[in-house]
């Protein structure tokens, strides 16, 4: 595919105003509600003068303008004063080798998916140049409702100078009764309580596609005009007229693109297009093959587990885009300027009044090697981040593991088919044999979901795609209601895995006969309070048990955690049963196609 327009850069936007999506706004300006003014509690006052200011001297880049400029980037405390060609009179000047860039902004994350508390998450990503994220905390909010949202917003205050901008969860529960057992609920009245908070920047992803098109989410969408919030979309599989209907209702972004057709559709509609590269969804390759440029594009990690943070970061994603032939400034824009414009942030640019978050790289090339990171006007290694304390509920498993059973026989069943590298699943109909409480067919395992909220509900089905899984894997991270999910070929192992959760509470783990390994998730059954290195070590012990008992050499937990999500096509299992998910309809379907054993 020809891409001759890439290397030339796009020039000054004042000369080319069409580069941004329709309805784009200038940095620091909300869609309708006016400027995004961060109160003095969150940004130091601009000094009248003195000797407290500091400046970098060297080459710098703000993607709003074309090319690399030379001069001074000046800040005082945690706030940028601006850039200039002239040496400042009242500033401590630091000569810099390399290129000075704005701190990177991840436009869509679920911090809970890291398995870490937010402060520990921030410590890791800031080393790679990420100084701000737009956090949709709907994982913890699904578990604990308004209490979880209050904790997230309080954490956004406590964690400064790291910026946890908040997207207000708009679909909690994602689906709810009768399709799944849930605990948390966020009504629009609850959302309004937090909508004017200075760290709240958007209405979180609107996952109820049919509800959006039918006007059932209008009250949440109206928060856009009432509070000047961006509205985040979630439209997997929608193209053509259906995509038009959905985005015409109000959503402005989409992070669910995973096919060339979807990426093309979003660009044609002028929707902010997010490209995911995380632990679960890896859409970068398709995006780089499809997109002609990166105007209106943001790179995001979405769900990124601690074990993958050494390999996946915004810095490396930008480098990959440059290596693929995209213009370096456009690639940098996808983690700086574009998120800033999309959400009206005071991050992502080197302009007066914005946060003094600065990244220095050796060059804008495929390596994007970091030489320095400053956050809130301080070197990152000198900053310690905090998060808020809260009594968030742990897992309450009331199902007796001995109750979980399935009659021996040969059946034609609907299997939840895994799609490697994607959170989507397929409906696969096939014959299977259950004998002595074990599935005898290659690449098929039992799938069991029990509620975590003490209601005692559970269901059993089948999953295809875990290969020769010869143990049981269990997780209390199960999107989005976070009930307990287990996969295993033998019911004895499945029961032992449920017993493990009953004994230790929230965790991810593996059980093979008498052996068990797990990572304790003591914060809402989603996150660990332990040191990140300890979490990674325990997680590796779990994976080693899976490898040694099964020969499975890939991480099954990201796939396992999404087989329960009943708002993404095509087939999902919840604690209430098997759910068929289509763009215009969600319904229960039978696990056994004819209701009786074949033999």
Curated annotation (Swiss-Prot):
Its cofactor is Mn(2+). Keywords: Hydrolase, Manganese. It comes from the Archaea. Its EC number is 3.5.4.2. SUPFAM superfamilies: Composite domain of metallo-dependent hydrolases, Metallo-dependent hydrolases. Residues 1-31 are annotated as: Disordered. One of its GO terms (molecular function) is adenine deaminase activity. GO terms for biological process: adenine catabolic process. It is an enzyme of class 3 (hydrolase). It catalyses: adenine + H2O + H(+) = hypoxanthine + NH4(+). Belongs to the metallo-dependent hydrolases superfamily. Adenine deaminase family. This is Adenine deaminase. It comes from Methanopyrus kandleri (strain AV19 / DSM 6324 / JCM 9639 / NBRC 100938). The lineage of its organism: Archaea, Methanobacteriati, Methanobacteriota, Methanomada group, Methanopyri.
């Amino acid at each position: 595919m020809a891409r001759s327009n890439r290397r030339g850069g796009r020039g000054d936007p004042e000369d080319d105003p069409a580069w941004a999506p329709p309805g784009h706004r200038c940095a620091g300006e909300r869609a309708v509600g006016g400027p995004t003014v961060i109160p003095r509690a969150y940004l130091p006052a601009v000094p009248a003068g003195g000797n407290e200011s500091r400046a970098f001297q060297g080459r710098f880049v703000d993607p709003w303008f074309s090319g690399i400029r030379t001069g001074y980037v000046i800040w005082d405390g945690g706030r940028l004063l601006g850039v200039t060609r002239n040496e400042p009179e009242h500033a401590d000047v630091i000569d810099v080798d390399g290129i000075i860039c704005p701190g990177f902004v991840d436009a869509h994350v679920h911090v809970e998916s890291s398995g870490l508390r937010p402060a520990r998450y921030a410590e890791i990503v800031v080393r790679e140049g990420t100084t701000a994220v737009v956090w949709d905390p709907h994982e913890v909010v699904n578990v604990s409702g308004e209490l979880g949202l209050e904790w997230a917003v309080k954490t956004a205050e406590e964690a400064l100078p790291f910026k946890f901008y908040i997207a207000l969860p708009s679909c909690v529960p994602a689906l709810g009764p009768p399709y799944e057992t849930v605990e948390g609920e966020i009504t629009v009245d609850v959302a309004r309580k937090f909508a004017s908070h200075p760290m709240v920047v958007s209405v979180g992803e609107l996952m109820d596609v049919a509800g959006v098109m039918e006007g059932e989410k209008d009250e949440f969408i109206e928060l856009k005009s009432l509070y000047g919030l961006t509205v985040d979309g979630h439209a997997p599989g929608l193209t053509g007229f259906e995509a038009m209907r959905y985005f015409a209702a109000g959503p402005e972004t989409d992070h669910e693109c995973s096919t060339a057709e979807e990426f093309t559709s979003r660009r044609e509609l002028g929707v902010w297009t997010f490209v995911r590269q995380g632990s679960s969804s890896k859409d970068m390759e398709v995006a780089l093959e499809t997109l002609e440029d990166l105007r209106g594009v943001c790179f995001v990690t979405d769900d990124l587990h601690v074990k993958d943070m050494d390999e996946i970061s915004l810095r490396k994603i930008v480098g990959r885009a440059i290596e693929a032939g995209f213009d370096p400034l456009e690639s940098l824009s996808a983690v700086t300027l574009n998120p800033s414009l999309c959400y009206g942030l005071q991050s992502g640019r080197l302009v007066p009044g914005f946060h003094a978050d600065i990244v220095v790289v050796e060059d804008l090339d495929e390596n994007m090697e970091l030489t320095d990171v400053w956050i809130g006007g301080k070197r990152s290694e000198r900053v310690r981040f905090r998060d808020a304390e809260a009594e968030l509920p742990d897992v309450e498993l009331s199902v007796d593991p001995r109750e979980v059973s399935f009659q021996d026989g040969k059946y034609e069943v609907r299997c939840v088919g895994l799609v490697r590298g994607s959170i989507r699943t397929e409906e696969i109909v096939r014959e299977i044999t259950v004998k002595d409480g074990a599935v005898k067919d290659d690449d098929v395992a039992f799938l069991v979901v029990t509620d975590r909220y003490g209601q005692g509900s559970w269901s059993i089905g089948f999953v295809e795609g875990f290969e020769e899984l010869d143990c049981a894997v269990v997780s209390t991270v199960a999107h989005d209601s976070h009930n307990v999910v287990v996969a295993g070929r033998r019911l004895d192992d499945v029961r032992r895995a449920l017993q493990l959760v009953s004994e230790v509470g929230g965790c991810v783990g593996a059980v093979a006969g008498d052996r068990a390994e797990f990572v304790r998730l003591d914060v809402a059954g989603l996150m660990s309070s332990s040191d990140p290195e300890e979490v990674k070590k325990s997680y590796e012990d779990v994976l080693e048990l899976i490898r040694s008992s099964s020969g499975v050499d890939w991480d099954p937990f990201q796939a396992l955690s999404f087989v329960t999500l009943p708002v993404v096509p095509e087939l999902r299992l919840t604690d209430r049963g098997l759910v068929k998910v289509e763009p215009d309809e969600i319904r229960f379907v039978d696990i056994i196609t004819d209701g009786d054993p074949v033999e």
